[in-house]
Amino acid sequence: MRSGVIAQKLGMTRVYNDAGEHVPVTVLRMENCHVVAQRTVEKNGYTAVQLGVGMAKVKNTSKAMRGHFAKAEVEPKAKLAEFRVSPDNLLEVGVEITAEHFVAGQKVDVTGTSIGKGFAGVMKRHNFGGHRASHGNSITHRSHGSTGQRQDPGKVFKGKKMAGHMGQTRVTTQNIEVVSTDSDRGLILVRGAVPGSKGAWILVRDAVKASLPENAPKPAGLRAGAKAEAAATEGAE
C-alpha cells in the first residue's frame, strides 16, 4: 500500500484524447509535497507517513509547528495529512513526492470537503418529489410530509431524511481515472468532477477497488535528489 498525496483543486477544463474526443477533467496541483514525519509500528503501533504541501508564512506558524518542520528540514506547510502505508513503502522524512507518483490510466480515490449549500429543503437535499401543486394542497408543496408513525413507536427514527444543512461534508469519490500528469508543473488531471471548491485541498490515493498498474513507481514518485535516491535504494532492497 503506497502513500497518497495532497493536491489543490484548481478547477475544471477539458482535454482531447487520441480519438479526438473531448474529456472533462479536474486539474489538481501538487506544490512542494514533502514527507514531514513517519509513523512506525515500534513507536506508534502502525505504519504511516505525514505529508505537508504548500507554503505557510513563518509568522503564522506556531512555535511548536516551526520546530516540527525544522526537524524534518522542510519549509512550513499550509496543509498536513497522514496516509497509512505498508512497511516496504515507508518514505524517508524530507523527500518530495511529484505528480509522477500516478500514471495515466490509473484509478484513484479522491477525498475532499463538498461545497456548502446552507440550509436546504428535502427536494434539493434528498431529491424528494414534493406534493401536488393544486387540488386542495395549501402551503405544503415542497414539504417532506409525515415524519413518523403514531404512539407506537412514538418517535422519529434516526436518519430520517429531513431539511437541514446541505454540503460541507467529507466526501470520497472512488475509481476516478487519471488522464495525464505533468511533473514539471505538478499537475494531475483526473476524469470528471472532484468534491470541493476551487482552491480546496484534495487527498488522492490509489484506488482500493482497482489493481495498481505495474508501471506505477514504488515506493513513490520522488523528486531526484540524495534523499530520494536513498529512499529508492531502500525500497528496492
UniProtKB/Swiss-Prot annotation:
<dbReference type="InterPro" id="IPR019927">
    <property type="entry name" value="Ribosomal_uL3_bac/org-type"/>
</dbReference>
<dbReference type="InterPro" id="IPR009000">
    <property type="entry name" value="Transl_B-barrel_sf"/>
</dbReference>
<dbReference type="GO" id="GO:0003735">
    <property type="term" value="F:structural constituent of ribosome"/>
</dbReference>
<comment type="function">
    <text>One of the primary rRNA binding proteins, it binds directly near the 3'-end of the 23S rRNA, where it nucleates assembly of the 50S subunit.</text>
</comment>
<feature type="region of interest" description="Disordered">
    <location>
        <begin position="213"/>
        <end position="237"/>
    </location>
</feature>
<feature type="compositionally biased region" description="Low complexity">
    <location>
        <begin position="220"/>
        <end position="237"/>
    </location>
</feature>
<feature type="region of interest" description="Disordered">
    <location>
        <begin position="133"/>
        <end position="155"/>
    </location>
</feature>
<feature type="modified residue" description="N5-methylglutamine">
    <location>
        <position position="151"/>
    </location>
</feature>
<dbReference type="GO" id="GO:0019843">
    <property type="term" value="F:rRNA binding"/>
</dbReference>
<dbReference type="InterPro" id="IPR000597">
    <property type="entry name" value="Ribosomal_uL3"/>
</dbReference>
<keyword id="KW-0699">rRNA-binding</keyword>
<dbReference type="InterPro" id="IPR019926">
    <property type="entry name" value="Ribosomal_uL3_CS"/>
</dbReference>
<dbReference type="GO" id="GO:0022625">
    <property type="term" value="C:cytosolic large ribosomal subunit"/>
</dbReference>
<protein>
    <recommendedName>
        <fullName>Large ribosomal subunit protein uL3</fullName>
    </recommendedName>
</protein>
<keyword id="KW-0687">Ribonucleoprotein</keyword>
<keyword id="KW-0694">RNA-binding</keyword>
<dbReference type="GO" id="GO:0006412">
    <property type="term" value="P:translation"/>
</dbReference>
<keyword id="KW-0689">Ribosomal protein</keyword>
<comment type="similarity">
    <text>Belongs to the universal ribosomal protein uL3 family.</text>
</comment>
<keyword id="KW-0488">Methylation</keyword>
<dbReference type="Pfam" id="PF00297">
    <property type="entry name" value="Ribosomal_L3"/>
</dbReference>
<comment type="subunit">
    <text>Part of the 50S ribosomal subunit. Forms a cluster with proteins L14 and L19.</text>
</comment>
<feature type="compositionally biased region" description="Polar residues">
    <location>
        <begin position="135"/>
        <end position="150"/>
    </location>
</feature>
